[in-house]
C-alpha cells in the first residue's frame, strides 16, 4: 500500500539482523520500523508513547500462545478506532477444533488459555470476530467504533 508504514518486533538477534539486511536491501528503511526486544517490553514502551505515531490500523499477533490475552490487551491500547487485530495460530495444531484428542502436557496450558481467550473475545460485544481455519487458524478481530 502506498504510504503504509510497518512497525515490527523481533527478539531473536539473528532474525533481527536478517530482517535489517532485508529491509535495507529492499530500500524500505523509511517505511519499516524494526524494533528489537521482548514484545511485552516494546509494546509497553509504545503504549507509554502517547503519540498518534504509536497507534495502528492493523496489528498482527504471532507470539506465545498462552499469553495471547495479554498481547491482545496491549494491542487494543495501541489501536486506532476501528482497527483490526489479527491473531495467528488460534487453533493450536487443531486442538481447539472440538477434537477429543488430549493435547498432551506440552500444549495443555496453551490450549486451556487459548480457549479462555476465545471465550473472552466472544463475550465482547464491541468486537466483530471471524475465526478462519486456514493454516493453524486466524482470528480477525475488528474493533467496533
Where are these regions (language model features)?
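S-adenosylmethionine/decaboxylated-SAM
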Residues: 1-145
Amino acid at each position: 500500500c502506498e504510504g503504509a508504514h510497518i512497525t515490527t518486533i523481533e527478539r531473536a538477534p539473528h532474525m533481527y539482523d536478517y530482517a535489517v539486511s532485508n529491509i535495507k536491501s529492499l530500500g524500505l528503511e523509511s517505511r519499516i520500523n524494526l524494533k528489537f526486544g521482548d514484545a511485552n517490553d516494546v509494546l509497553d514502551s509504545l503504549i507509554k508513547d502517547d503519540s498518534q505515531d504509536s497507534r495502528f490500523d492493523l496489528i498482527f499477533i504471532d507470539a506465545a500462545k498462552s499469553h495471547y490475552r495479554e498481547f491482545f490487551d496491549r494491542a487494543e491500547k495501541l489501536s486506532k478506532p476501528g482497527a483490526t487485530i489479527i491473531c495467528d495460530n488460534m487453533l493450536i495444531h487443531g486442538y481447539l477444533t472440538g477434537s477429543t484428542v488430549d493435547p498432551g502436557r506440552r500444549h495443555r496450558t496453551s490450549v486451556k488459555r487459548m480457549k479462555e481467550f476465545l471465550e473472552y473475545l466472544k463475550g465482547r460485544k464491541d468486537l466483530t470476530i471471524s475465526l478462519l481455519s486456514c493454516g493453524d487458524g486466524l482470528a480477525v478481530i475488528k474493533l467496533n467504533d
